[in-house]
């Protein structure tokens, strides 16, 4: 309950800022020390403006760094798998607990809408760089929406070279674009069914198993600790224990 209260407090703060931004969004207007400059090769804005534009980041207690979440209900493949018995999406954690609170849902949908903003890529990169974190997880809730979204994620990763990015996905079409992914991004295809073998056609994957897990989190207070396997391109597959 305490963790939920912290999450709601953080989301509420970001939501307030995001709403103010949306109310004044549109063509950038000159303001003292808060003007957004747009040039062909770069975008410059204040960190506070970037936060308002993208709708905030999340800070999962288990993770060593920051994350970014979208509505799980809007997962293209996951929204179908959640109805399938024995799938890795059955009983999805992002569809219960703190995630179902109205303030969290509203914040996630604002983030989803903001992806189409022309300044989203630059704002995300600025925000991630401002955290000075070595590790970032995409979509602790939700998934890649389409090719345009994926290309924007690639661009954000290139603009944050000091950060290692991890993108788990159940969208099989993403495989066609793996060769375009920047070196600091690891894309892991998540096997759709529990105890299903990792597909050999993907360079990096994750699976959910009833026995033989490799993720150490359950043995260390449900936290990553010093493990960074999910971000390591040399780790072929990460096996999570079934919840």
PLM regions and their residue ranges:
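Class I S-adenosyl-L-methionine
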Residues: 2-15, 19-20, 37-243
């Amino acid at each position: 309950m305490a963790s939920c209260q912290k999450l709601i407090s953080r989301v509420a703060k970001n939501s307030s800022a995001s709403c103010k931004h949306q109310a004044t969004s549109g063509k950038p207007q000159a303001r003292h020390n808060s003007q957004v400059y747009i040039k062909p090769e770069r975008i410059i804005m204040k960190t506070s403006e970037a936060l308002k534009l993208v709708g905030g980041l999340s800070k999962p207690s288990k993770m060593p760094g920051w994350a970014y979440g979208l509505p799980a209900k809007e997962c293209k493949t996951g929204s179908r798998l959640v109805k399938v018995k024995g799938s890795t999406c059955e009983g999805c954690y992002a569809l219960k607990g703190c995630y179902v609170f109205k303030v969290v849902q509203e914040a996630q949908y604002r983030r989803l809408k903001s992806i189409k903003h022309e300044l989203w890529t630059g704002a995300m990169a600025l925000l991630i760089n401002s955290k000075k974190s070595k590790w970032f997880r995409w979509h602790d809730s939700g998934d890649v929406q389409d090719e345009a979204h994926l290309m924007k994620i690639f661009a954000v990763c290139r603009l944050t070279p000091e950060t290692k990015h991890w993108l788990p996905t159940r969208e099989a079409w993403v495989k066609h674009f793996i060769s375009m992914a920047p070196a600091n991004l690891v894309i892991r295809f998540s096997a759709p069914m529990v105890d299903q073998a990792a597909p050999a056609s993907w360079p990096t994957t994750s699976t959910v198993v009833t026995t033989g897990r490799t993720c150490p989190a359950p043995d260390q207070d449900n936290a990553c600790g010093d493990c960074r396997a999910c971000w390591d391109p040399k780790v072929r597959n990460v096996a999570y224990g079934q919840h």
